[in-house]
Amino acid sequence: MRYPWFRLAIFVVGCLFPAWWLYEAAMSLLGPDPGKIMMDRLGLGALTFLLVTLCMTPLQKLTGWSGWIVVRRQLGLWVFAYIVLHILAYLFFILGLDWGQLAVELRKRPYIIVGALGFLGLLVLAITSNRYSQRRLGARWKKLHRLVYAVLGLGLLHFLWIVRSDLREWSIYALIGAVLMVLRIPAVARGLPRVARARGRAV
């Protein structure tokens, strides 16, 4: 296994936040509605992990270090794990496992549908995030995994629909997402290694 300590660090970070939030909930530190706080934090955690995952390719091109790419799949699976926990928190703490209430929730809060579409996209990416799928799909695998940008867009829309008026935090996530999208433009992506070489010569 390459870069085991880097992988371990990501695993620890991925586990640490939910564990800390559970501790806060157990100690009654999350206010009068800890279930909602947990749900919101898990959703933001998933969006953060998604943006970090999308940073890996630009970082590899800028630094030439292959470790960024090695952990990309692991980070992507953490995105999926946080989203699953986010959904479970919603079902248990908000919906109370009252399935009859779900239709009412979907009518009142259509952003849930947007979030569900994002989850389905992540599910496809998680299922095909393995070497077997890469071999089976061939060149189509890369095209399929561009779906991650649609997932990012749906996640940002879901977040925007929830916050509505206070856009300060949302704007930070959206700006980072926009920068990452610009870095995907072929002309820009091809220029990243040249930037890295120029920096190396300057040093």
UniProtKB/Swiss-Prot annotation:
Sequence intervals crossing the membrane: 10-30, 42-62, 75-95, 110-130, 147-167, 169-189
Entries under Pfam families matching the protein: Ferric_reduct (PF01794)
A GO-annotated cellular component: plasma membrane
Chief localisation class: membrane
Gene Ontology molecular function: electron transfer activity; FMN binding; heme binding; metal ion binding; oxidoreductase activity, acting on diphenols and related substances as donors
Cofactor note: Binds 1 FMN per subunit. Binds 1 heme b (iron(II)-protoporphyrin IX) group per subunit.
UniProt keyword list: Cell inner membrane, Cell membrane, Electron transport, Flavoprotein, FMN, Heme, Iron, Membrane, Metal-binding, Transmembrane, Transmembrane helix, Transport
Cofactor: FMN; heme b
Subcellular location: Cell inner membrane
Record membrane topology: Multi-pass membrane protein
Swiss-Prot/TrEMBL GO biological process terms: protein repair
InterPro entries recorded: Fe3_Rdtase_TM_dom, MsrQ-like
Record family assignment: Belongs to the MsrQ family.
Assembly and interaction partners: Heterodimer of a catalytic subunit (MsrP) and a heme-binding subunit (MsrQ).
Function noted in UniProt: Part of the MsrPQ system that repairs oxidized periplasmic proteins containing methionine sulfoxide residues (Met-O), using respiratory chain electrons. Thus protects these proteins from oxidative-stress damage caused by reactive species of oxygen and chlorine generated by the host defense mechanisms. MsrPQ is essential for the maintenance of envelope integrity under bleach stress, rescuing a wide series of structurally unrelated periplasmic proteins from methionine oxidation.
Alphabetized PANTHER family for the sequence: PROTEIN-METHIONINE-SULFOXIDE REDUCTASE HEME-BINDING SUBUNIT MSRQ
Protein name: Protein-methionine-sulfoxide reductase heme-binding subunit MsrQ
Natural source organism: Pseudomonas putida (strain GB-1)
